[in-house]
């Protein structure tokens, strides 16, 4: 979780699943001899198929520059890449490189679209989803080529129902 904004009723309290907490959890897991599957949710709140809220700390630039459409997508693509790369480097530096990395959490038909009923134009737009997932994947591959990249669909048992979301 990149920042600390309030998005919905499921708000993560200060210090819970923030970067420092995630690094500490990774250290505990490795100390116990466990493999790590690290999920990048890119949200201050629980992200799921209904809600993919843009992190609070990323919003001032968006709002201050009235970003929409491709400009907004380009900005978010850069933030996803930067945040993913930064966290991966921190994990590697402390000796907890994850074996598996999930780009996004419980994705339905998009990533960072806010809410599917009142969205910013990224819901059900496979081109944007592809750009965002590729930005995170590129950061993982550059920092840890041995880590396996996974995607977490909200309908894992019915993956074909989400197939169109990943077709560009």
Feature roles, as predicted:
Residues 1-125, 130-148, 152-154:
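Substrate-binding cleft and catalytic face of glycoside hydrolase catalytic domains
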Residues 49-50, 157-168:
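Distinct, well-ordered alpha-helical segments
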């Amino acid at each position: 979780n990149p920042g600390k904004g309030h998005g919905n009723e499921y708000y993560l309290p200060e210090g819970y699943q923030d970067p420092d907490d995630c690094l500490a959890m990774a250290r505990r897991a490795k100390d116990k001899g466990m493999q790590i599957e690290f999920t990048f949710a890119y949200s201050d709140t629980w992200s799921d198929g209904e809600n993919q809220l843009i992190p609070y700390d990323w919003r001032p630039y968006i709002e201050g520059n009235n970003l929409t459409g491709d400009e907004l997508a380009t900005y978010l693509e850069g933030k996803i890449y930067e945040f993913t790369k930064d966290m991966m480097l921190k994990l590697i530096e402390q000796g907890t490189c994850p074996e598996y990395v999930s780009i996004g959490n419980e994705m339905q038909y998009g990533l960072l679209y806010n809410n599917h009923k009142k969205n910013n134009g990224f819901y059900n737009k496979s081109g944007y989803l592809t750009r965002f997932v590729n930005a995170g994947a590129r950061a993982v591959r550059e920092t840890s080529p041995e880590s396996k990249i996974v995607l977490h669909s909200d309908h894992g048992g019915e993956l074909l129902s989400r197939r169109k979301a990943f077709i560009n």
